[in-house]
Design a protein with these regions (language model features):
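Residue-level detection of the helix-turn-helix DNA-binding "recognition helix"
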Residues: 23, 37-38, 53, 82
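Alpha-helical residues within the helix-turn-helix
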Residues: 23, 34, 68
Length: 84
């Protein structure tokens, strides 16, 4: 199956932004995973790591949960240039 990757070869466009925002909010990957679990999303800190490192594809549902857990609009999770 063919899968589209970002220009930098990663599997998502939002991983770096998620890591930046998480660090700005002084959250560990484990604490972010717990916040997402409290929203009913079954994840652990390995999921967060894989997203941030660009190893995992991210769905629209993932974006919604990240935005709710980080208390930010979804648009802030995406890079400004959106280059593929």
């Amino acid at each position: 199956m063919f899968k589209i990757k970002a220009a930098d070869g990663t599997n998502n466009l939002c991983g770096k932004r998620i890591a930046e925002i998480r660090k700005e909010k002084r959250l560990s990957q484990r604490k972010l995973a717990i916040k997402m679990q409290l929203l009913g999303f079954d994840v652990d800190h390995y999921f967060i790591r894989r997203v941030e490192n660009g190893e995992r594809f991210v769905t629209d549902i993932d974006l919604v949960i990240f935005s709710r857990a980080l208390n930010i609009p979804i648009s802030e999770l995406l890079p400004e240039d959106m280059a593929l």
